[in-house]
Amino acid sequence: MSRVKVAVLGATGSVGQRFIQLLDHHPFFEITHLCASENSAGKTYGEVMKTRWKISSDIPAYAKNLVITTPDPAKTKDVVLAFSGLDSNVAGEVEKNYANAGIHIISNSKNHRMDPTVPILSAEVNSSHLEVLTSQKTKGKIITNSNCTIMGVTISLKPLLDRFGIESVMLFSMQAISGAGYPGVPTMDILGNVIPHIGGEEEKAEIEPLKCLGKVENGKILHADFSISAHCNRVPVFDGHTVCVSVKFKKKPSREEIISSWKDFSGEPQTLGLPLAPNPVILFREEEDRPQPRLDLDTGKGMTTVIGRLRPDPILDWKYVVLSHNTIRGAAGAALLNAELLYKKKFLG
């Protein structure tokens, strides 16, 4: 069976590199076009990335000889789908151009997330939101990932919301430096330090989970009806976003009921047996000092959400710690899992 031809936009960036790694020998998709800025256009990917490849494994052989082009749908007419790791400064217009040209977009940028006809898709959490795609007026459809920080948070909240209802959430993030892209945060700012502000992150952390966990009515996504308060911090960890979460419930669960809801949680990717679907979706660890990025980040090849330290909260009801891989589960891996879901559900033709 022939594979679907795809492009990667922003192929030289940190998320673009993850796409290229994860799509190596993928059973559904074949990268035929790599797109980046004019500075890289006309050169082979291997030439451009000699000193810029920042993943521990080598550049996949298939990508080295692909010639980079600028992100223009006229230059990628044969692709069905484009994975976008573009910076938000340019992503909005470029992604819209691809959709207008009939090429589907799965985006990691913030630009289209708040459009009520664009799903912020987390494949296990809200696959039903795909039905709003019919409300988009373009031939190509736009789907977005959430902000990488709240990907694991949203996954952790979904089974709790379904079983017990949620009134409010407080979260405190410790976000890895890779989340800022490359070259990222200056060394003298982050070494031996914590930066208690990341521009725009708290606003995204307080609103995006509500859309992810909302419901579809009349072709639009309505937000979930609870409130979130967020503190977002940059810490000197390379990969892995750790978030401390406190939750107030409508129906008061026991510790055992919460853990059971996490252990039982799965979604359509697991039912369909998608290649990148983690099993388990959530791993709960009983050790009092877990999860840790150094020890738990690669669980499920970076796709499993790891939770620990569940205990009573004297102000709300319960609190816990959640860890997810920000460039895999929170970015390229989530986008690829979304694409696998689209493929299996025949959205790609």
From Swiss-Prot:
Protein residues bound to phosphate: R113, K204
GO biological process: 'de novo' L-methionine biosynthetic process; diaminopimelate biosynthetic process; lysine biosynthetic process via diaminopimelate; threonine biosynthetic process
Keyword Glycoprotein (UniProt): no
Major enzyme class: oxidoreductase
Pathway named in the protein's UniProt entry: Amino-acid biosynthesis; L-lysine biosynthesis via DAP pathway; (S)-tetrahydrodipicolinate from L-aspartate: step 2/4; Amino-acid biosynthesis; L-methionine biosynthesis via de novo pathway; L-homoserine from L-aspartate: step 2/3; Amino-acid biosynthesis; L-threonine biosynthesis; L-threonine from L-aspartate: step 2/5
Pfam families xref list: Semialdhyde_dh (PF01118), Semialdhyde_dhC (PF02774)
Oligomeric form and interacting partners: Homodimer.
Family in the record: Belongs to the aspartate-semialdehyde dehydrogenase family.
Primary role: Catalyzes the NADPH-dependent formation of L-aspartate-semialdehyde (L-ASA) by the reductive dephosphorylation of L-aspartyl-4-phosphate.
Cited HAMAP family: ASADH (MF_02121)
Record-given protein name: Aspartate-semialdehyde dehydrogenase
Native source species: Leptospira interrogans serogroup Icterohaemorrhagiae serovar copenhageni (strain Fiocruz L1-130)
Lineage: Bacteria, Pseudomonadati, Spirochaetota, Spirochaetia, Leptospirales
